[in-house]
Amino acid sequence: GGPHGPYKQSERLDTYRPYVDKLIEDGHAYYCWCSQERLAQLRADRAAAKSPQTGYDRMCLGMTKEERAKLPGFTENPVVRMRVPDDVELGFDDLIRGHVRAPRPDDQVILKADGFPTYHMAVVVDDHLMGIDTVVRGEEWISSTPKHILLYTWLGWQVPRFAHMPLLRNSDKSKISKRKNPAARLMWFREQGYLPDALRNFLQLLAYPILGKGQEVESFESFVARFDWADIATGGPVFDLKKLDWLNGQYIRNLGPEALTSRVFEYVDRM
């Protein structure tokens, strides 16, 4: 449900296509008929030559389908690429990190050969149509932000505020993933008997400074009242389950007899 449905991208293909067509008509995007084999060979040739150049070489830019079909490496099923200008602005203001400068993007694919949009196109269209004014996501998306700002600008839309959160790390500093760490799955915490408030408090501690020494247990209301984007730590916080165990114990001991009994029965029923 909800006022902005449908929410599955596969059910919104007719929503995305008009915006892709507009970008093509305005000269901000173009069809690319290069085959996967041709693109793979391009990457291999550059690697062999130790070329610093990366990204697509714009072979199809300015060509019609008929013109491109006469050249090697052609496919009947094109993708659509955004045409990134040479003078693209690479800097943007981040709510957490201040002014950030990202690498220069290449001509990103925004519509795949099967008619599905890539993340870059879909997220911009969806966020705009759903009224999102603040985008909060992981720091791995910093490099994509100039592309997204371009798409917002080309489509005549208000650019949202961006906040790029630090990624949670395992104890060995590697990125947390579902394959390596069961704790990457939200329902795992419920299955293990962690209380929601304990988990919320734990996540606060990972990226936000505590009130003071010995004041690690904090209500959500207190946290919201003192929240400031600029205070979020940018270093990759380590996911320490021992700290979560301790916090869970604090919250369990603060439960009244009836609440504790209810929680125990809920946990047993799920076993």
Name each model feature, range by range.
Residues 143, 155-271:
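Catalytic adenosine-cofactor/nucleotide-binding cores of aminoacyl-tRNA synthetases and other
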